[in-house]
Design a protein with these regions (language model features):
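Charged/polar, low-hydrophobicity segments characteristic of intrinsically disordered regions
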Residues: 5-12, 51-59, 114-121, 167-177, ...
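Helix-start/N-cap signature of alpha-helical segments
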Residues: 4-16, 26, 30-35, 51-55, ...
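Catalytic and GAP-homology cores of small GTPase regulators
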Residues: 184-188, 192-349, 376-463
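Hydrophobic residues within the alpha-helices of tandem HEAT/HEAT-like
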Residues: 15-26, 41-46, 76-88, 118, ...
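Extended alpha-helical scaffold segments
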Residues: 141-150, 568
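Structural recognition of alpha-solenoid helical scaffolds
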Residues: 18, 22, 33, 37, ...
Length: 574
């Protein structure tokens, strides 16, 4: 099972250390394992402390089982920092997950979690977890910074000194309680300025050239180099469009389908096969909405359900494992007739793939329905008296074409269902189970578990702007909190250097809004510090600026950025 937030620190440390070592030595073989480890273990552990703080802020008491939360979170965050320092980790996550239509956006999830964990709870002092979260964000920025430094002749710090100090370690940071007013969201959430609605419908239709999104991505793929970078950028843009389309479908399938047709994501002459492929492969779909759509008795929806079932390969897979896979993409509706209709189609598909496994499709249907009933009985807390193995066997007597099922088949199914629940709820959080691990192993056996060749230095630079656009806002926000709450001069200087580094990367990629935002943030600190000193000590602004080290540091950073990157300042001059 996956590590829980209150897992004993030695166990968490051993698991995280083991995986870090495996990734460092066997990277090319661990694509699917990395995705599972990040989404099921590491990211939830990093977020555990934030969830606990939110509970405490809402007045809920914490029990003793939460005692290991902070230490386990620290171990997880240290593991993230170590992984982010690996040469290919950031690009691996971005290229192979965020740019893959069939995968979760692991890199974006990681950045969001680090961003949220970097901000202390209301009124709380800066903790070690907050600082480690900032270090994780800076480690990602450092990856981009190396490429920027390599291709830029002006790699030296505008403040002087070694440019490598711009993103130096911040473990020595100290904090004093204060109220953050840094111009960013208080919860550390990313303020993504990118417009999700991007291209016009006509432009996207022309780009797709009649192909569905998955055929288009396959046609645009390349093994390496600039061609691969271009293909992945197209895939990433298309994935965002699919997420928007999924949101429309989640609100109203009736309106969502015309929206997708308008953008060329579904053909004008709507086919059940195209809709089924969208329902199976598109990211961001609400499983409950998908289940209701597939269970609809209308003729077109029934055809979609049949096409949906045909997208699965059930050959040489046991009935219960195939059923798990089939039900993974949607939530079974609550209405008995809809459940029956879905299981009937599943049974026909399963029997077609495994004609020697049972007498006929009706037999597969009856056993499938019995499995659903067993699953509900075994895992519903309201059911006090659980079904026994003998009762399960008795319930299925004579249902295999009038004959009994082999006892070993029913025993194996019973044990599998009782020990490993088929999740029938719309649970967005990924879970580790025997069946999920079995799916990973099957995918590895057919060659789907390997990373592509790592990008060379030139190709890697092609992803820098995209990675930086995701990470700059939470990094700047987190560093601003560190800057505001710090009392140590070295910490202030490190924070300033980090700001300047982010500005340098933004300038290199001509992200003028980012440079404007950074300068405005530093100027806000200058104004606040000067006004506070004047009000408290009745000093003139010039004297106040000279006596307050934090205000001086902020002014120094603002002028350094303006001096070095003035060509990329727009509103920041005002």
């Amino acid at each position: 099972t996956s590590l829980k937030p209150n897992a004993a620190p030695p166990i968490a440390a051993a698991a995280c250390g083991c995986f870090t070592m495996l990734y460092a030595t066997m990277r090319s073989e661990l694509k699917l394992q990395l995705e599972m480890f990040m989404r099921i273990v590491l990211i939830p552990l990093c977020a555990a402390g934030k969830n606990k703080a939110s509970t405490a802020a809402n007045g809920a008491s914490s029990n003793s089982s939460d005692g290991f939360n902070s230490e386990t979170q620290r171990i997880a965050l240290e593991t993230v920092v170590d992984l982010c320092r690996q040469p290919h980790f950031v690009t691996d996550c971005y290229m192979h997950f965020d740019c893959d239509l069939s995968k979760a956006c692991v890199f974006e999830e990681l950045v969001s979690t680090l961003s949220a964990s970097a901000f202390p709870a209301n009124g709380a002092k800066l903790s070690g977890a907050n600082v480690l979260s900032v270090e994780g964000l800076l480690a990602i920025v450092r990856t981009v910074s190396r490429s920027t430094t390599a291709e830029s002749s002006s790699a030296s710090s505008p403040l002087g000194g070694d440019s490598s100090m711009l993103l130096g370690e911040s473990s020595g940071m100290k904090a004093a309680p204060s109220t953050a007013t840094n111009g960013f969201a208080d919860d550390g959430s990313m303020q993504n300025d990118e417009e999700e609605e991007g291209d016009s419908p006509a432009a996207l239709r022309d780009e797709l050239r009649g192909l569905d999104p998955w055929e288009y991505v396959k046609a645009s793929a390349a093994p390496s180099g600039i061609a691969r970078a271009r293909g992945l950028r197209k895939s990433r843009a298309l994935k965002r469009r699919l997420v928007v389309a999924a949101e429309h479908f989640n609100r109203s399938p009736k309106k969502g389908i015309p929206y997708m047709q308008e953008y060329g994501l579904l053909p004008e002459n709507l086919s059940a096969k195209a809709v089924a492929k969208f329902l199976k492969l598109a990211p961001g779909l609400d499983k409950e909405v998908v289940g209701e759509y597939l269970g609809d008795p209308k003729d077109f929806q029934v055809e979609v359900l049949k096409e949906y079932a045909d997208l699965f390969n059930f050959e040489n897979v046991t009935l219960d494992k195939a059923l798990r896979t089939f039900l993974d993409g949607f939530k079974l509706p609550g209405e008995a007739q809809k459940i029956s209709r879905i299981l009937e189609v599943y049974a026909v598909r399963y029997y077609g793939a495994n004609p020697n496994s049972c007498a006929d499709a009706d037999s597969a249907y009856v056993l499938s329905y019995s499995i659903i009933m067993l699953n509900t009985d075994a895992h519903n807390k309201q059911v006090k008296k659980k079904m026994t193995l003998e009762q399960f066997i008795r319930n299925n007597r004579g249902t295999n074409g009038g004959k009994d099922w082999p006892k070993e088949t029913l025993v194996a199914i019973f044990d599998s269902i009782v020990t490993d629940e088929i999740r029938l709820t719309d649970d967005a959080a990924p879970k580790l189970s025997n069946s999920a691990w079995h799916d990973v192993m099957r995918a590895c056996e057919v060659g789907e578990g390997k990373f592509d060749a790592p990008p060379d230095e030139f190709e890697s630079r092609q992803y820098d702007a995209d990675v930086f656009s995701l990470v700059w806002a939470p990094t700047a926000a987190a560093v601003a909190v560190i800057f505001e709450r710090a009392t140590d001069e070295d910490v202030l200087e490190s924070s300033v250097e980090a700001f300047v580094a982010v500005a340098r990367i933004a300038s290199n990629h001509r992200m003028t809004d980012v440079v404007d935002h950074l300068v405005a943030t530093m100027c806000a600190f200058v104004t606040k510090g000067a006004q506070s000193a004047v009000e408290i000590n009745l000093l003139r602004p010039g004297v106040a600026l000279g006596e307050d080290i934090k205000t001086r540091s902020a002014a120094k950073a603002a002028f350094a950025v303006a001096n070095a990157h003035g060509d990329d300042l727009r509103r920041g001059w005002c």
